[in-house]
From Swiss-Prot:
It comes from Synechococcus elongatus (strain ATCC 33912 / PCC 7942 / FACHB-805). HAMAP family: Cytb6_f_PetN. Keywords: Electron transport, Membrane, Photosynthesis, Thylakoid, Transmembrane, Transmembrane helix, Transport. The keyword Thylakoid applies. The chain crosses the membrane at residues 3-23. Pfam families: PetN. It is found in: Cellular thylakoid membrane. It comes from the Bacteria. This is Cytochrome b6-f complex subunit 8. The 4 large subunits of the cytochrome b6-f complex are cytochrome b6, subunit IV (17 kDa polypeptide, PetD), cytochrome f and the Rieske protein, while the 4 small subunits are PetG, PetL, PetM and PetN. The complex functions as a dimer.
Amino acid sequence: MELLTFGWAALLAVFTFSLAMVVWGRNGDGSIGF
């Protein structure tokens, strides 16, 4: 795997995870402390 491809994949994974944290945090279920 090329390093650039791996870098973009990692960046996308982090972005997706962060977006999920924000969405779940705004649902107000209180299970996540954001």
